[in-house]
């Protein structure tokens, strides 16, 4: 049992799953884990893709690089993208040439091309410093992030965002961008 009551402990628990011999060993012969799987195809790893120390779920397509990460079902990671130390939940799309460091990305998120996440100083989140911390980028479900933006550490983003939401193309470390429920 592990307490995952914070984003930091949730991230740590997922990173422990990809240890050589994880504390919570998914491969124990005497303690099998049974799940009812969806009927989806196996994951696809392109010939020139790179994957190391990661869990890649069924239905996922990887054309870029994935390092030390946990990737959910049905995710698409496009060519040139580099994912490090991150958790990406099901049905999300990561754009071409994105660089994502230490992020938790929820379900059904679309990230445009040439996006960089996890840059800058490790300063506390201004809105909820006890929640959005640990140097993580946190992206809520059904969020859209436009192409060509940079996102700092200890940030939170939710909703359908546009380039205008990123002054100078940047969401600085410690900032929160909440567009949930907004309509045009």
Each model region followed by its residue ranges:
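Left-handed beta-helix
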Residues: 1-184
